[in-house]
A protein has these predicted regions:
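Extended amphipathic alpha-helical segments enriched in small hydrophobics
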Residues: 227-259
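Polybasic, glycine- and aromatic-enriched phosphate-binding surface used to engage nucleic acids
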Residues: 2-235, 245
Length: 260
């Protein structure tokens, strides 16, 4: 049964499930109260123009007329992940890159001037009919839309997909972008990221999240921020996840028996 006067109101859980859920919530602090930020990946408005494979990247670099242009262009083209590339604890090297002709950050970083990147401009001009009419663009059709958290892609971060069968989080310390089928978490303190990384990948939290979230049939969940931000994570310290949430042997056995 479910007590409809509690936070379990809209989820039908068995008594043991309700007990586990309450214990998790009693010990953990919701992610929304941690010193973190969650952002969505880049929306290009035309992936076929701005997301390229390694062959096209080499072609663009080979078309640069000077060594200075080649260096600038190499720094502009960055690896990018999609939601399907995110696995638990790791990501797949998909060989894809983002042409990061960003729109700058007001008062901090100027937008990319395409005239400084002739080889990139020649590539994008092949898609002019599409990039010129897209809604998601910057000051010029060559620029990506505004992104105030642009510099956070340079920081250590946790990536996760917007649709996933399980909670799959991977840690990335490199400069890495992601597209709009992916979210990422950043924090000023890397210890926080490492702590969250361990808990968010645990199947106990996977089970808990599925009591909150929107499920797509029986095989996937949507990782909406309104639900992700409610995941209760305990303070940094204890390593035994079951112990820190005060689960008894029966509750541990129940979670271990679930096919998540």
């Amino acid at each position: 049964m479910c007590d409809f006067s509690t936070s379990d109101s809209w989820v039908i859980l068995s008594p043991i499930e309700q007990s586990i859920k309450r214990k998790i919530e009693a010990v953990g602090t919701p992610l929304k109260d941690w010193d973190i930020n969650i952002y969505r990946g880049v929306l290009t408005g035309c992936n076929e123009a701005f997301m390229i494979d390694s062959t096209k990247r080499k072609e663009i670099l080979s078309n640069c007329q000077t060594e200075e242009e080649r260096k600038r262009t190499d720094e502009l083209i960055r690896p990018i992940l999609r939601g399907r590339d995110i696995k638990r604890y790791e990501y797949v090297d998909n060989g894809l890159y983002l042409i990061n002709t960003h729109n700058g950050i007001k008062g901090k970083l100027p937008r990319i001037d395409i005239n400084d990147y002739p080889a990139v401009k020649a590539h994008l001009d092949q898609y002019w009919d599409k990039i010129s009419v897209r809604a998601d663009k910057g000051d010029t059709p060559y620029n990506l839309r505004n992104c105030t958290y642009l510099e956070d892609f340079n920081k250590p971060k946790l990536f996760y997909a917007d649709i996933s069968r399980h909670l799959n989080f991977c840690f990335c310390r490199d400069i890495m972008f992601c597209n709009n089928t992916t979210y990422f978490i950043v924090a000023e303190n890397n210890l926080i990221l490492e702590h969250l990384y361990r808990y968010l990948n645990h199947h106990l939290i996977d089970w808990y999240y599925k009591t909150l979230s929107v499920q797509l049939g029986t095989n996937a969940v949507r990782m909406f921020s309104i639900y992700v931000l409610e995941i209760p994570i305990p303070p940094i310290g204890e390593n035994d996840i079951y112990k820190v949430y005060n689960l008894n042997d029966s509750e541990i056995a129940y979670i271990e028996s679930k096919e998540l």
